[in-house]
Amino acid sequence: MRRCRPLSSALVISMIFAGGLRAQSAQPVSLQGSVLFNGVFGNAFTGLQDGIGAEGQIRYTPSAFSIGAGFQYTVHQIENRSEDAQIYGGFIEPRYRIHAGSNVVAPYVSARFSLLKVGFSGGDLSLSSSFIQLNAGGGLLYRMSSRVNLDVGATFGYNRLGDGTLTSESTGGSVPVESSTGSNIVARLGLAIGLGD
């Protein structure tokens, strides 16, 4: 009987540990909504001020690695114009969560590929070009409950605006827009809600 005690103790400990892991693991699918600050620099953003906006995404988390896909939207004032510019489009974001020995707080690193368009308020101006945006950075997840995480993050990005045409509907005039590059810094504050069991 004495020889069985170490084995039985090990089994009990392993069962408790496994149960703890299940309690700590997030649901594999989650929805996230965030508010954004988008600071813009370079020729691709000439005339645009820093902007604010929002994003929504769905994320699949099978392990420490996860993949998200969603839609982002920011609004930017234009120098010497009454219109605002809207930068919007879809993105894919892989992420890797770093184990830091805590069940409450977890840092992560991330990358993001976005394909974006530019729109203008008022309906007079239109731009045929698209943005390609590549961002990298990281953040911190704070566990608020078994289903809800607070997400605070920031990324730095490379942006390329393709060739296109800027058209005024009221005058019928158009101006060619040459391909150009720029950079951006995005700060994000959001909530992620786990779905299912």
For the regions a language model picked out, list residue spans one by one:
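Structural signature of outer-membrane beta-barrel domains
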Residues: 38-42, 74-78, 114-118, 157-163, ...
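Outer-membrane beta-barrel translocator domains and adjoining extracellular loop/strand segments
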Residues: 43-50, 78-85, 118-127, 163-171
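Predominantly the C-terminal beta-signal and adjacent terminal strand-loop region
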Residues: 145-197
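Cleavable N-terminal export/targeting peptides
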Residues: 1-28, 196-197
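Short glycine/proline- and aromatic-enriched beta-strand/turn motifs that initiate or cap beta-hairpins
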Residues: 23-67, 73-76, 182-197
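Residues on the lipid-exposed face of transmembrane beta-strands in outer-membrane beta-barrel proteins
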Residues: 35-39, 54-60, 71, 92-96, ...
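Outer-membrane beta-barrel channels and translocator barrels
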Residues: 26, 61-65, 99-105, 143-147, ...
